[in-house]
Amino acid sequence: MTTLNARPEAITFSAPQSALIVVDMQNAYASPGGYLDLAGFDVSATRPVIENIKTAVAAARAAGMLIIWFQNGWDDQYVEAGGPGSPNFHKSNALKTMRKRPELQGKLLAKGGWDYQLVDELVPEAGDIVLPKPRYSGFFNTPLDSLLRSRGIRHLVFTGIATNVCVESTLRDGFFLEYFGVVLEDATHQAGPEFAQKAALFNIETFFGWVSNVADFCDALNPPLARIA
């Protein structure tokens, strides 16, 4: 068993019965010229997040954890996004941006396009699972729950973008399904001002899960004394 230093208290889990979830590390959310950037959100601080996720993924993989990569988006005709009868049509900033700028139609979060692709630095490997998702939560209209339950996985460690949107939404839904959720705060980034990150982390550690960081996560999976030995 592994004990991870976290807030509000440490949490113990079995690495082989846990999953590291990488949420939406796509050009859309982490690269200049991607959807968030074009919609007016600041993506200038995402590079350290990418490096921290690389570190967390390597540690998790070495410890035998399942790695799950999410990609948020829809078909290039946006049928999966829902029409005016869906609240997603009205609240998705990607869809709103394309309505304001018709020249972007078919480019933002469209499967097969650059915006939808994972950033170059993060590459899934054999044995990882890559899941498309059509809404903020990774549990909505995806096989995530059955994939986890069939493997006996109950603990989920979250990284990715955006902390206050898709990361928090997926962790919250997991909480309602009896999963233990941990977020690595320095391997996430918010959409919006810094207070959005702080509020999301407050919600998670107070009501829905635990908050840790990449260094403590790596040390828990591979303690320094074990590395020296």
Curated annotation (Swiss-Prot):
Gene3D superfamilies: Isochorismatase-like
Annotated GO MF terms: hydrolase activity, acting on carbon-nitrogen (but not peptide) bonds, in linear amides
Matching SUPFAM superfamilies: Isochorismatase-like hydrolases (SSF52499)
InterPro entries: Isochorismatase-like_dom (IPR000868), Isochorismatase-like_hydrls (IPR050272), Isochorismatase-like_sf (IPR036380), RutB (IPR019916)
Highest taxon in the source lineage: Bacteria
Pfam families assigned to the protein according to its UniProt record, in alphabetical order: Isochorismatase
Active site residues of this protein: D24 (proton acceptor), K133, C166 (nucleophile)
Annotated catalysed reactions: (Z)-3-ureidoacrylate + H2O + H(+) = (Z)-3-aminoacrylate + NH4(+) + CO2; (Z)-3-ureidoacrylate + H2O = (Z)-3-aminoacrylate + carbamate + H(+); (Z)-2-methylureidoacrylate + H2O + H(+) = (Z)-2-methylaminoacrylate + NH4(+) + CO2
CDD domains: cysteine_hydrolases
GO biological process: nitrogen utilization; uracil catabolic process
Keyword vocabulary terms for this entry: Hydrolase
Its EC number(s): 3.5.1.110
Family: Belongs to the isochorismatase family. RutB subfamily.
Protein task: Hydrolyzes ureidoacrylate to form aminoacrylate and carbamate. The carbamate hydrolyzes spontaneously, thereby releasing one of the nitrogen atoms of the pyrimidine ring as ammonia and one of its carbon atoms as CO2.
NCBIfam families the UniProt entry points to: RutB
Descriptive protein name: Ureidoacrylate amidohydrolase RutB
